[in-house]
């Protein structure tokens, strides 16, 4: 079953977020989660397995700036998607993406975008399996001033 993330399931959401983004502190994750819950331009969904435990999540945001490879605005942007290892290959990501797409359409979007690190081949395979088409490969640069 797919449910929207809310104040009643924060602990499970935090656990899944921490598994996907382990470098973030619990305090940082909680602050971002509060921002998502307070924003009309963001939402998050979780998947609950047959045993009642939450096993996967997806976060999505509306982006009004340019999104690489997209032709419309706003664009629904998949900020993160994760399935616990014990629940992989059971279709949870596909069910989450279906819910994300429905939300995006309700927000007036005609495109769903995402990104991943160029070295993250597992994520690239997942995106392809979920129906995403690669649009660009970009290298970012930085120069410190001072």
UniProtKB/Swiss-Prot annotation:
Q: Which protein are we looking at?
A: Aminoglycoside N(6')-acetyltransferase type 1
Q: Which residues bind acetyl-CoA?
A: 120
> Which keywords has UniProt assigned to this entry?
Acyltransferase, Antibiotic resistance, Transferase
Pfam families per UniProt: Acetyltransf_1
Q: What class of enzyme is it?
A: transferase
**What range does the record give for the signal peptide?**
none
Which GO molecular function annotation, any one, does this entry have? aminoglycoside 6'-N-acetyltransferase activity
Question: What is this protein's function?
Answer: Catalyzes the transfer of an acetyl group from acetyl-CoA to the 6'-amino group of aminoglycoside molecules conferring resistance to antibiotics containing the purpurosamine ring including amikacin, tobramycin, netilmicin, isepamicin and sisomicin.
- One of this protein's GO BP terms? response to antibiotic
Q: Matching Gene3D superfamilies, A to Z?
A: 3.40.630.30
**Record text on subunit structure and interactions:** Homodimer.
Q: Where does substrate bind?
A: 21, 66, 79, 115, 136
Stored CDD domains: NAT_SF (cd04301)
The organism's place on the tree of life at top rank: Bacteria
Domain N-acetyltransferase residue range list: 1-146
Q: What InterPro entries does its record include?
A: Acyl_CoA_acyltransferase, Aminoglycoside_N6-AcTrfrase, Bact_Acetyltransf, GNAT_dom
EC number(s) per entry: 2.3.1.82
**What is catalysed by this protein?**
kanamycin B + acetyl-CoA = N(6')-acetylkanamycin B + CoA + H(+)
């Amino acid at each position: 079953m797919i449910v929207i993330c809310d104040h009643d399931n924060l602990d499970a959401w935090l656990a899944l977020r921490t598994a996907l983004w382990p470098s973030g502190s619990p305090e940082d994750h909680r602050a971002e989660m509060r921002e998502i819950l307070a924003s009309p331009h963001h939402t998050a969904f979780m998947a609950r397995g047959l045993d009642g435990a939450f096993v996967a999540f997806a976060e999505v945001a509306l982006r009004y700036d340019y999104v690489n490879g997209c032709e419309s605005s706003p664009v629904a942007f998949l900020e993160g998607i994760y399935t616990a290892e014990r629940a992989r290959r059971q279709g949870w990501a596909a069910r989450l993406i279906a819910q994300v797409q429905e939300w995006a359409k309700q927000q007036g979007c005609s495109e769903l975008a995402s990104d991943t690190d160029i070295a993250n081949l597992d994520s690239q395979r997942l995106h392809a399996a979920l129906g995403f088409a690669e649009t660009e490969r970009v290298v970012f640069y930085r120069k410190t001033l001072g």
